[in-house]
Amino acid sequence: MNRANSLLLKTLLPVAIGLAVVVWLFASEFDIADWKRIPWNLHTILAIGAAWLFMAGREAGLAWRFRCMTDRDLSWKQAIKVTMLCEFTSAITPTTAGGSALSMVFMNREGISGGRATTLMMCTLFLDEAFFVVMCPVIFLLVPSSVLFGFDTGSVGSGIRWAFWAVYCGIVLWTLLLFAGIFLRPHKVGEWLTRLFRLKWLRRWEEDIAGIAHSMVTTSEEIKTRSWKWWTEAIAATVTSWVSRYLVVNALFIAFATGASQLVVFARQFVVWTLLTVSPTPGGSGVSEWLFTAYYGDLISDASVALVIAICWRIITYYVYLATGALMIPSWVKQGVRNHHKQ
């Protein structure tokens, strides 16, 4: 019962935070006249439908990655199940924790051995971080910094700019550490991390870091046997999943704000998701809604329309996972109980 109550609280907390921010934004920015000017026609409906299709593409990309990285040992149904459970855990935990760490638990439940599942978890983590590292120079080659961060000349604009570069530098360092730990010197990196987190002010994470250090060694031994074809498919699936997630907002802008530059909309999604990797709230609740309306406001003529797009975006990319996960978790727990009794 306590576990059920804890899960219910973790599910309702991000919803409450998100709704509180939405109510505040509605009270301060929503104008019914702007809402009435939105043309609810076939064009709008088709564009919203495209946004849902792009989100399905995101899940297909992640499921494809689980399939290829497990050498097709996971069926499509199992891969989609693991994907949705990962998305649910991401939705109810701070984005700094994320759902990737639990993917090994979900894969293990579907028949992948614990050691192998740990290896695959480390690889997916590395691929996601590497995507951000590589995409940054590409984005800034296509869209100048003045356009990405020129939406506000005050403290909000400069704050987002500095926060982005701070987070991006952190991602680069973390990715380099993962690369060295997985591909180059896993034992040395593991020893260094273990010693570092024995320091008094870092000791609270010592146990977690010890687990990561051990996973790096295990992953390094497993990865050496992998072919370029395996890596190419995993990279393609990673790119598909992230690009599809970005394109959700492009489709929503086509629905509600056709005058905005689609390239700028796409590029700003990279900034948004980079910042959300360090959100302290579950699934970025509250932070996402505010950040979206503030950051995209200059591309939309009416603040009310920006709020409508933000809400649609969060429903498609977040709240649907809370609902789906809440439906899937009970059967997943029952399956674990049955497996335990069989043993």
Regions found by a protein language model. Name each.
Residues 60-85, 252-268:
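Membrane-embedded helical hairpins/re-entrant loop segments and their flanking transmembrane helices
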Residues 1-37, 89-201, 281, 285-343:
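Transmembrane helix-loop-helix hairpins in multi-pass inner-membrane proteins
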Residues 77-87, 116, 263-274, 304-312:
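Alpha-helical transmembrane segments of multi-pass membrane proteins
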Residues 35-44, 72-75, 111, 219-227, ...:
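Helix-boundary and loop/linker segments of multi-pass membrane transporters
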Residues 82-88, 191-216:
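Juxtamembrane inter-helical linkers in multi-pass membrane proteins
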Residues 53, 85, 123-130, 236, ...:
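Hydrophobic residues within alpha-helical transmembrane segments
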Residues 7-12, 41-50, 221-235:
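Membrane-interface helix starts
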Residues 208-256, 260-262:
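Alpha-helical transmembrane segments and their immediate interhelical loop/hinge regions
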